[in-house]
């Protein structure tokens, strides 16, 4: 067997060939295996793909030029959320395969290798459209997701990345979800967090008022209450960002007299109503990480207690289905969204800590999908060239490594503890 990194030699082979690929980088939790299966189908090659602890393994078998074309497409056009660091290629003996399969993950292969885990990804445009489409079976489903979006890092309990190794393990797929999961043409093909109203997690409301949980939370917020909301990486404390009394109460309860709060709006248009959002800031707000972005506040749109004495305010846009449903019920405006904790303490993320939250919030909007890894909202500033400057690197970026770039990119990786 000989290793190679190019496809030129393969393309000249007319007979059946088989290539064994080991692909490393950010290749788990980003729809990589389904995309490999689509590539194989499009190019008429057989074989398989599977997750292993340190990589994705794939074998392509077929006429040489078809195999070469499939490899070239995989390398040049991977899934948008993936990052390929290397593809190691070996030629191996053809096995006579006639189909291509996504195999069960192999946790016995390269168990000592390090695996890049995908960060949590903001809701994609397709899922957002379906969320508010009355004809869609996931209409208003607070946990809509697909291979292109949704929680990853915060729900993964083990590797390789498969549903049994996530906090979705206890939610058995209904037949409709199972059919989508098994359909190579579906956007949810092998989407590990797939769910729907029949088989997925559910919201719960603990507070005054009845009816649907989101509607009850919206009514409480509109009335000036402070509501704890379980999100992707932990609980937020939320209140109306234009309500001086609510913001003052929140500061008193959190023992946070002056440190600025971040605010959340439904979308970019809402962000521009409360802050000066230029094109670079908008790119960050709309990106898959959906961080808090520090931008100049617009006078008179927020309570002066949100960021007292400061020119800038931290703004983020709704990044989860629950957030979008909440803003749809609330209407235009902004919410303070701050971590549910006392000053200096870690974010609350375990449902067993709800009794402790009682001293901070008037009510709780929660759900039964466990959070395995807590994750705060990331914070970035924008420099004069429009590039992000990380202030706090967490949700949407963690646990990916930081690229040093330039000459530093050739230096050894160092883990500081």
Predicted feature residues:
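Intrinsically disordered, low-complexity, mixed-charge
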Residues: 1-193, 197-204
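Active-site-adjacent structural elements in enzyme catalytic cores
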Residues: 106-417
């Amino acid at each position: 067997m000989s290793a190679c990194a190019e496809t030129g030699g393969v393309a000249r082979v007319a007979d059946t060939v088989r290539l064994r690929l080991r692909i490393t980088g950010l290749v788990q939790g980003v729809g990589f295996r389904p995309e490999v299966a689509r590539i194989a189908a499009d190019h008429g090659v057989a074989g398989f793909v599977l997750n292993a602890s340190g990589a994705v393994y794939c074998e392509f078998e077929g006429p040489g030029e078809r195999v070469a074309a499939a490899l070239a497409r995989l390398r040049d056009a991977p899934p948008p959320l993936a990052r390929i660091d290397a593809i190691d290629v070996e030629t191996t003996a053809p096995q006579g395969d006639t189909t291509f399969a996504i195999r069960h993950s192999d946790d016995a292969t390269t168990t000592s290798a390090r695996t890049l885990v995908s960060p949590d990804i903001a809701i994609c445009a397709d899922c957002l459209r379906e969320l508010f489409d009355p004809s869609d079976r996931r209409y208003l489903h607070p946990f809509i997701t697909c291979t292109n979006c949704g929680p990853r890092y915060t729900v993964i309990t083990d590797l390789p990345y498969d549903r049994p190794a996530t906090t979705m393990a206890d939610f058995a797929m209904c037949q409709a979800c199972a059919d989508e999961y098994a359909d190579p043409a579906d956007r949810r093909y092998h989407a590990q967090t797939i769910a729907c109203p029949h088989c997925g997690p559910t919201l719960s409301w603990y507070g005054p008022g009845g009816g649907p949980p989101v509607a009850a939370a919206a009514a409480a917020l509109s009335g000036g209450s402070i509501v704890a909301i379980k999100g992707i990486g932990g609980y937020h404390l939320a209140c109306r960002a234009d309500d001086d009394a609510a913001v003052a109460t929140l500061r008193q309860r959190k023992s946070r007299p002056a440190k600025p709060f971040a605010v959340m709006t439904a979308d970019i248009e809402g962000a521009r109503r409360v802050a000066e959002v230029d094109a670079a800031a908008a790119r960050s707000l709309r990106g898959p990480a959906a961080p808090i972005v520090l931008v100049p506040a617009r006078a008179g749109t927020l309570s002066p207690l949100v960021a007292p004495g400061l020119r800038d305010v931290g703004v983020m846009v709704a990044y989860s289905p629950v957030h979008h449903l909440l803003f749809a019920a609330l209407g235009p405006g902004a919410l303070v969204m701050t971590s549910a904790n006392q000053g200096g303490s870690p974010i609350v993320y375990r449902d067993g800590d709800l009794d402790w939250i009682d001293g901070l919030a008037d009510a709780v909007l929660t759900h039964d999908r466990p959070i395995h890894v807590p994750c705060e909202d990331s914070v970035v500033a924008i420099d004069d060239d429009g590039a992000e400057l990380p202030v706090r690197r967490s949700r949407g970026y963690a646990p990916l490594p930081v690229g040093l770039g330039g000459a530093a990119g050739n230096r050894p990786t160092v883990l500081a503890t």
